[in-house]
């Protein structure tokens, strides 16, 4: 009788151990699957955010590229004649703050201010340029210190003549770069060696990542810019 009781107790103990192990394995598998699913979902949201920002900015810059054929011939005209077409083109391109005509390195006509006589290098040290140039900078004329995105199209071999289109990127920042907490903690636009950070303006270096963060970057296939998105790392 005692032997039978020991067998029953041994069986119950083994069954309890097996059930406990099965429960622990099930819990671990459930948590692992949930963690992987959550990580994949976060990565998907990060990629979708970056794709949306790149596509949106591509859509802003493409009309400028197409419209340069309208603007470049205006360089042959005096400002008194070219000013009205400049204003109309700026109004048509709703994201453009202003358009300027540059002749021999001198900004001589602006869609906002009309006739001017200012060396373009005084306003933007990187201009004029021999080739097409996209650059991040700050406004030195209208809303001083505010972020701007400049698209430059040269019209002469030496780059001294050209068209400067200024995109009001400050107004687009909320649409493009506003973080979506908690999956996305920060986002930035990089053009050349400068970066536009949401809430911080134009800076020369991206902030260092925290130890529990990682950064995803996506570059445009059509224009020289990159969107960077930061958020919790996969291990968090």
Show the residue positions of the predicted features:
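Extracellular/periplasmic juxtamembrane segments that couple receptor/chemosensory ectodomains to their
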Residues: 200-236
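Surface-exposed loop/edge segments in extracytoplasmic proteins
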Residues: 107-108, 194-200
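Conserved beta-strands of PAS-like sensory domains
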Residues: 143-181, 188-192, 197, 227-233
